[in-house]
Regions:
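Alpha-helical support elements that line or immediately flank enzyme active sites
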Residues: 1-7
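Helix-centered, glycine/charged polyanion-binding patches within enzymatic domains
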Residues: 95-100, 106-107, 190-256
Length: 256
């Protein structure tokens, strides 16, 4: 319900459950039934994640949507999911560094922070990462999706550590799940234009119409692929994955 009706927080959802008849009907509550405390969500979240309830729900949705999915043309992409950790929590692993000032805040001015020497005290698994040149480095993870190109439906999603190889490694893992038996295409942005990715995909009988990266080097995508009429179609279709990312972050509450 939070996602469908853009309810910004669990506390707000509980508040609306007290008077919203539609919400009460959705969860099977009687009109005069007491609403639970918002802390119940926090207590149950770990249990639901451990039991893979969300994954089970996702697979059932995929089963219903299967008639509308392409089995030939796909797209992979990744996006930065911010961690619930502030930049000020990203300190040296050895405990050294500038001492806290007034208010307990640490002054990082002039200090070069790297994942090799620093980590977040509140989320040690988060990594300082920037998705593209010129963008701000943030503490977070990388989210990865596999999309079919006919209607822009997502077939797979998962989260990894944020690092320079994560998107390409995730693409290979998702490519392995695409059913064989026919020749398929897997498009992506310039980040996937490497000899390693292109060769591995071709070894799986997958054509890689990924965007070419010609900056200071030669693209790994050959001319027969780029000249094919389907290349331009794949490039147009792959941009639909950005719509999924925008929805996930603006509506689906997955910005962090």
């Amino acid at each position: 319900m939070q996602v469908f009706y853009s309810v910004r927080s669990e506390r707000m959802l509980i508040e609306q459950l007290q008077y919203n008849l539609l919400f009460q009907w959705f969860v099977g509550m009687e009109m005069d039934e007491a609403v639970w405390n918002h802390a119940v969500f926090s207590k149950n979240r770990e249990r639901l994640l451990n039991e893979e309830i969300a994954e089970s729900f996702f697979q059932r949705v995929l089963g219903r949507a299967k008639p509308h999915m392409s089995d030939e043309h796909f797209t992979v992409d990744g996006t930065l999911i911010e961690a619930w950790a502030s930049q000020k929590s990203f300190g040296r692993k050895d405990g050294k560094g500038n001492p806290p000032g007034a208010g307990g805040e640490v002054d990082f001015h002039g200090e070069k922070r790297k994942n090799q020497t620093h980590e977040s005290t509140t989320d040690p698994d988060a990594r300082l990462f920037k998705k593209s040149t010129g963008s701000e480095a943030k503490l977070g993870y990388l989210g990865h999706v596999l999309m079919e190109n006919r209607n822009g439906l997502l077939l797979q999603t998962f989260l990894t550590e944020a690092n320079g190889r994560a998107e390409r490694d995730a693409a290979m893992l998702m490519a392995e799940t695409i059913p064989g038996g026919k020749r398929v295409t897997l498009s992506g942005d310039k980040n996937y234009d490497t000899q390693e990715v292109v060769q591995e995909l071709r070894g799986m009988n997958i054509t890689p119409p990924v965007a070419q990266n010609n900056t200071k080097r030669r693209s790994a995508v050959d001319e027969p692929t780029t000249r094919h009429a389907g290349f331009e179609v794949s490039q147009r279709k792959r941009k639909r994955v950005e719509q999924s990312f925008r929805w996930m972050k603006m509506v689906g509450m997955l910005r962090k």
